[in-house]
Amino acid sequence: MGLELYLDLLSQPCRSIYIFARTNNIPFEFKHVELFKDSVLGKKPAAASGAERPRTGPSNSEGDGKISLLKKVPVLKDGDFTLAECTAILLYLSRKYNTPDHWYPSDIKKRAQVDEYLSWHHANIRANAPKTMWIKVLIPLFTGQPQPSEKLQEVMEGLSTSLKQFEERFLQDKAFIIGSEISLADLVAIVELMQPVGVGCDIFEDRPRLMEWRRRVEEAVGKELFFQAHEMILNIKELSNIQIDPQLKEHLAPVLMKMLK
């Protein structure tokens, strides 16, 4: 049995793993796990012009809970070995498939810089960027109530602070976070920052240094692959017209509200 990756490309960590594996020509079977089942999402958005929809294995809406004891994605299954958590999966793939050194450098100082960003990321960029989608799409979808503009403003202020720190502390005047080549740090950062873009919060506008960094990341992984991986998130607003099963709505509404706090 070969490598299997259980992913939903609505998820930022899943997108980073998908892009990393494809960019490095790692052979794997894409097991599409739908965090919001087909009955919720309805028909998925058509592929963007020039982008081929990712090839997937059978939908795993029934069995995904059996794959990971944590019952969440992403999950890697390599024979009888199962691994969860984005960073752990990225590092496993980089080591097993001996990917180019720039992704996770052998140089101890450069590797430490990647580790530093990955540690900082969770309490800063990841703590703010996803909330834009919860406020603008998911909470209204599951509660039937739009969130007050003050909520979004509060989140955007927190995100702006994180972006300022990102530019000044990590990006500085470099092409990428650790220097002249892309690393896992850049990949983990960019997929997170595309989340607000998908709901109409263009955080790259009026930030030329950040915009240029994004352009370089897109070119490093390939623009076609980049937009293929982000197709679903860039069409996330289409969810607003979906009819939600009342039981699912009752279950998820308080969960989302709790995550926003």
Curated annotation (Swiss-Prot):
Q: Which GO terms describe its biological process?
A: glutathione metabolic process
Kindly list the places in or outside the cell where this protein is found, as annotated in its UniProt entry.
Cytoplasm
Keywords of the record? Cytoplasm, Transferase
- GO cellular component entries: cytoplasm
> What Pfam families does the annotation carry?
GST_C
Q: Name one GO molecular function term.
A: glutathione transferase activity
What reaction gets catalysed by this protein? RX + glutathione = an S-substituted glutathione + a halide anion + H(+)
Q: Which residues form the GST N-terminal domain?
A: 2-101
The EC number(s) given in the record are: 2.5.1.18
GST C-terminal domain segment(s): 107-248
- Tell me which residues bind glutathione: K72, V73, E85, C86
Name the principal localization, coarsely classed.
cytoplasm
In terms of domain of life, where is this protein from?
Eukaryota
The top EC class, named as a word, is transferase
- Which family does this protein fall into? Belongs to the GST superfamily. Theta family.
Q: How does it assemble?
A: Homodimer.
Record function comment? Conjugation of reduced glutathione to a wide number of exogenous and endogenous hydrophobic electrophiles.
Q: Which PANTHER family match?
A: GLUTATHIONE S-TRANSFERASE THETA-1, PTHR43917
- This protein's name: Glutathione S-transferase theta-1
Please name the source species: Gallus gallus (Chicken)
Question: Which gene name belongs to this protein?
Answer: GSTT1
